[in-house]
């Protein structure tokens, strides 16, 4: 005879209802404007840099500067617009003093502990006899 193991078909589930997501309207600004600037002067790392940028419609103007490792200051002035594309002019001014070298941090490796490999007894040898 047939022995039943007590198995049954998997239950059927209904699909979750689908709802249309409400998309937020995308706001288009035909004449965008912004202006930002920042600067960094970190005596500990020697990091010195600055940036300024403005946008009026489709025209972007800005500049950024940084101190090179030799102490000179590199300044890049740039413009971008639909007619001329992106244009940059780089200026370099000799520095009075070289930029401070980053602080060297000594890295000491932790000591490595060595242990002898464990010793094991020899594996038993098996043989056979032919009768």
UniProtKB/Swiss-Prot annotation:
Extent of the sequence repeats:
9-12, 15-18, 109-112, 116-119, 122-125
Ranges of residues in domain Chitin-binding type R&R:
31-101
Pfam families, from UniProt? Chitin_bind_4 (PF00379)
Q: Which UniProt keywords apply?
A: Cuticle, Repeat
GO molecular function, a single term: structural constituent of cuticle
Q: Which domain of life is it from?
A: Eukaryota
One GO cellular component from the entry? extracellular space
Physiological role: Component of the cuticle of migratory locust which contains more than 100 different structural proteins.
What does the record's free text say on domains?
Answer: The tetrapeptide (A-A-P-[AV]) repeats found throughout the protein are also present in many proteins constituting the protective envelope of other species.
Cited PANTHER family: CCP84AA-RELATED, STRUCTURAL CONTITUENT OF CUTICLE
Q: What is this protein called?
A: Cuticle protein 7
| Species name | Locusta migratoria (Migratory locust)
């Amino acid at each position: 005879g047939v022995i039943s193991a007590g198995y049954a078909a998997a239950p059927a589930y209904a699909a979750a209802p689908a709802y249309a997501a409400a998309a937020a309207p995308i706001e288009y600004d035909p004449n965008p404007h912004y202006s930002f600037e920042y600067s960094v002067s970190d005596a500990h790392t020697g990091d010195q840099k600055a940036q300024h940028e403005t946008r009026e419609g489709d025209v972007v103007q800005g500049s950024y500067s940084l101190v090179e490792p030799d102490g000179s200051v590199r300044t890049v002035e740039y413009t971008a617009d639909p007619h001329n594309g992106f244009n940059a002019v780089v200026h370099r001014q000799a520095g009075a003093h070289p930029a401070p070298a980053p602080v060297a941090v000594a890295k000491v490796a932790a000591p490595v502990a060595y242990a002898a490999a464990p010793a094991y007894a020899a594996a038993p040898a098996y043989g056979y006899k032919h009768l």
